């Protein structure tokens, strides 16, 4: 039995999200913004399928992580995440953006993993178990950065993640987490 699509997706979400911490800590702000714009442009090429016939191996890799409903616009959720991360870099301090990235990568990743595999109590298209997984995992991951405020940020993040909305939570969560970190 192979690894489920949802497990692959969420593992990629967690690791890919946390990977943003490397340029955040090692590049000057101007280089960070240029790098982020490059990533967004590349991501947009994938979503719009502008080079699919030229880089088929990359698309085959992308399709390993993509849900059936997103095959027309592959990597669209990654684009939303990368846009939210870019705006966090642009508008918030490095420390605040770190909180937004960790909240999104860890909280949303574990909410999806637990909710998909163990979720029984449904709240719309999400689950109560996923909500608690978001809260617990992001509280633990954020504690070294913000101490007890991790509980508040994790709770607000879990609420944002579970509520039905027209805006992708991969876009909202980095901004919400970054803003909360700067406020407290």
PLM feature segments, named:
Residues 1-184:
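Hydrophobic alpha-helical transmembrane segments
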């Amino acid at each position: 039995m192979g690894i489920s699509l949802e497990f692959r997706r969420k593992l990629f979400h967690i690791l890919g999200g946390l990977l943003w911490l490397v340029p955040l800590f090692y590049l000057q702000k101007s280089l960070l913004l240029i790098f982020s714009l490059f990533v967004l442009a590349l991501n947009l090429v994938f979503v719009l399928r502008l080079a699919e016939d030229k880089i088929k191996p990359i698309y085959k890799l992308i399709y390993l992580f993509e849900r059936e409903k997103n095959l027309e616009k592959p990597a669209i959720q990654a684009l939303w995440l990368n846009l939210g991360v870019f705006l966090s870099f642009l508008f918030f301090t490095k420390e605040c953006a770190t909180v937004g990235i960790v909240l999104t990568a860890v909280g949303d990743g574990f909410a999806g993993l637990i909710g998909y595999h163990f979720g029984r109590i449904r709240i719309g298209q999400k689950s109560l178990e996923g909500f608690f997984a978001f809260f617990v995992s992001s509280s633990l991951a954020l504690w070294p950065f913000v101490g007890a405020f991790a509980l508040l940020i994790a709770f607000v993040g879990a609420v944002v993640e579970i509520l039905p909305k027209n805006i992708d939570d991969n876009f909202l969560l980095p901004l919400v987490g970054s803003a909360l970190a700067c406020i407290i």
